[in-house]
């Protein structure tokens, strides 16, 4: 089993409820420092946010539907970077994915990549539970062509569901280590987290980080 410290450094400690208050975000940041998580992930309206030393700041773009114009995603990304975001978790345009217009999917992602140049990290949320296997593979390939750093399973808000071991494994096999793979949505205990890691996840999006980490040995 992966060590607690190693798992903590894979976690984006997440609070994306629209009703989250600044006090709750501050508490999230404090807890991230105590738990030793890699980052916090909060909504862009909460930026800038103070975090303990060693904790990174991630935010979301086009969230949760992805159904906004590409230029809006790019503008949202630029503002988030200006406000201190070190990592951007963007949602693909699912209509384009379902239409199998992968050139458009790639262009949408590339616009965000261009608005968040390295060293900012760009993660692409593909909403894997809403896709078939061919769509998962093709969307991951589009993300790689567009210059993304990670592919990510889910927003956690889609009715189709969150991360699955099958999707994570397929995503990891597709990107073959060239991109990271983030599993998020419905991971609430150590057993589920370890299953995602074993399937190939290199980052975990968790709102229940403390409960998950309790199940790992130090």
UniProtKB/Swiss-Prot annotation:
It catalyses: 2-deoxy-D-ribose 5-phosphate = D-glyceraldehyde 3-phosphate + acetaldehyde. Its EC number is 4.1.2.4. Keywords: Cytoplasm, Lyase, Schiff base. The active site is at residues 89, 152, 182. It is found in: Cytoplasm. The keyword DNA repair does not apply. Gene3D superfamilies: Aldolase class I. The keyword Cytoplasm applies. Pfam families: DeoC. One of its GO terms (biological process) is carbohydrate catabolic process. One of its GO terms (molecular function) is deoxyribose-phosphate aldolase activity. Pathway: Carbohydrate degradation; 2-deoxy-D-ribose 1-phosphate degradation; D-glyceraldehyde 3-phosphate and acetaldehyde from 2-deoxy-alpha-D-ribose 1-phosphate: step 2/2. One of its GO terms (cellular component) is cytoplasm. NCBIfam families: deoC. Belongs to the DeoC/FbaB aldolase family. DeoC type 1 subfamily. Catalyzes a reversible aldol reaction between acetaldehyde and D-glyceraldehyde 3-phosphate to generate 2-deoxy-D-ribose 5-phosphate. This is Deoxyribose-phosphate aldolase. It comes from Corynebacterium aurimucosum (strain ATCC 700975 / DSM 44827 / CIP 107346 / CN-1).
